[in-house]
Amino acid sequence: MSIPIRADQLRSRYLAFFSQKAHVVISGKSLVPEHDPTVLFTTAGMHPLVPYLMGEPHPAGTRLVNAQKCLRTGDIDAVGDNSHLTFFEMLGNWSLGDYFKEEAIAFSFEFLTGAPWLGISPDRLSVTVFAGDEAVARDEESAAIWERLGIARTHIHFLPRADNWWGPTGETGPCGPDTEIFFDTGVPPCSVSCRPGCSCGKYVEIWNDVFMQYRKDADGRYRPLERYCVDTGMGIERTVAVLQGKRSVYDTEIFTPLLERIGQLCGKRYGCQGAHDVSMRIVCDHIRAATFILGDPVPVRPSNVGAGYVLRRIIRRSVRHGRKLGIDGEFLSSLARVVIGQYAAVYPELEEKATCIAQELANEERKFLDALRKGEAEYERMIPKFLQGTEREIPGSVAFRLYDTYGFPLELTEELARESGLRVDRAGFDTAFQAHQACSRIGAQRVFKGGLADHSAETTAYHTATHLLHQALRVVLGTHVQQKGSNITAERLRFDFSHPRPMSAQEKVQVEQLVNEQIRADLPVCCEVMSLEDAMNSGAVALFGEKYESTVKVYSIGTFSREVCGGPHVARTGQLGRFSIQKEQSSAAGVRRIRAILEKSGEKS
């Protein structure tokens, strides 16, 4: 039995169903959390709603529903099999102190089995509930609700905390039991003990309802919360595959257009199994993820740190597997166009940023292709001696040389090594990397945090000018511009910022003029002390990846610029003199560098 439902139908029906149940459809949030430094990407539908699940009132009310873009990077190396994905969409409905188990479970059952919605026979469903332990009682309430709705008692399974309990995220906090809903694929059971949660493939989880009803305290006790919440999640890709009777998410219409395009580029047909299918799935998943990251409202560019490193890694892994398939030359931009065409109606920001997405992919691909050819040749040259060794290990120093010289992420070298039956000395790589960092710091010890060489009047003036420059770049080039570094002395400023291409002569003139307009306006420079949360909510710009204290200083220059900063700054912009850009050049991949000076009255550059 299969249910012919497409991904777009599942998404629209889910939102429509819960709208009828008095839920407010809220928009999904950015794939890159703006105010949560603990994670690189939004990993679940509930992630953006954590403050509201913890008690903060949501402006849209107490019943919410949405579709959320998510990205998980823990299993990147597993991508290539039939099921693993990095990017996926999560459907979710929430009750913030409104309904609880009775209504939540009834809603799930009605959507899954109701004829206007999915129309699944209740006989194909099995559920799991919390079995209880010494700390919290067995969840008989959820089991009884399922049975009243029509799920046979033999299809209700009590599982331990490891399977049916959520939270807390730390040592203390909100938590509670959950109930998971599984679809019976119809394949024979693997054994007499086969049940939901078994890895044989007979049962596939399609929905999870989490009931936050307890708080775990520091003494280890669980106490009832004053306000109960419900958090649910259904992955679109997996659910569509299961309902369509497909053995793999990659066999659905979600991925077919991409796989067909990859097949056209490499001259191979997907579905013949073997290494080619694995590489096609890797390219398919990774270009989909990269397109959504690059198209996100919060800008991320390929780099060697944080979210940028994940982006660089999946792009470069795509390039390598494209070469394994026989694709010669650049190809990622054409695949991104397929992704954009599929999703632009739901996520219009992809079409809006299509040119930027294509440029970033082309730049990264072009840069890596040459290095990949040389690096693979170097790897093939040296690999025989490691294959002959008894340890069958690539030294960390060699892995670091591939990273430093050819831009091979450590994970790429490890992937090459696995294909050759080798392993990589990770500890040795870390040692070589740390030694390289130590050498890079020599000669830079005099620079204070924030890039200031001293706190003289001249250096302070350049510091304020840097804030004006940063905002001017964001106005002229776009809000994707982020500060990547600065070095400020009493003679000049040097400012590194994210931007995929050289600035045009006109853009440099516009930036220079905009900065000088603010200087001529003699704007006041004001400092406020506030919580980091208040600072971010007020629109202050902060350095991506920087670790801030809970209380920060925010410097505002009139209404033109507002940044989280430790200072010092001048009192008014009229003290700066004339701003002049001396040079604009590349600093690193996707990073530009400006050198500028301040001219006092009578000076000329």
Curated annotation (Swiss-Prot):
Q: Which cofactor does it need?
A: Zn(2+)
Q: Where in the cell is it found?
A: Cytoplasm
Give the reactions, separated by semicolons, that this protein catalyses. Answer: tRNA(Ala) + L-alanine + ATP = L-alanyl-tRNA(Ala) + AMP + diphosphate
Q: Which Gene3D superfamilies did the record assign?
A: 3.30.54.20, Bira Bifunctional Protein, Domain 2, Threonyl-trna Synthetase, Chain A, domain 2
Record keywords: tRNA-binding included?
yes
Give the Gene Ontology MF terms in alphabetical order.
Answer: alanine-tRNA ligase activity; aminoacyl-tRNA deacylase activity; ATP binding; tRNA binding; zinc ion binding
Going by the UniProt record, its keywords in alphabetical order are: Aminoacyl-tRNA synthetase, ATP-binding, Cytoplasm, Ligase, Metal-binding, Nucleotide-binding, Protein biosynthesis, RNA-binding, tRNA-binding, Zinc
Q: Which residues bind Zn(2+)?
A: H463, H467, C565, H569
Q: Which family does it belong to?
A: Belongs to the class-II aminoacyl-tRNA synthetase family.
Which NCBIfam families does the record match to this protein?
A: alaS, PRK01584.1
Could you identify this protein by its name? Answer: Alanine--tRNA ligase
Which source organism does the UniProt entry give? Treponema pallidum (strain Nichols)
Phylogenetic placement of the source organism? Bacteria, Pseudomonadati, Spirochaetota, Spirochaetia, Spirochaetales
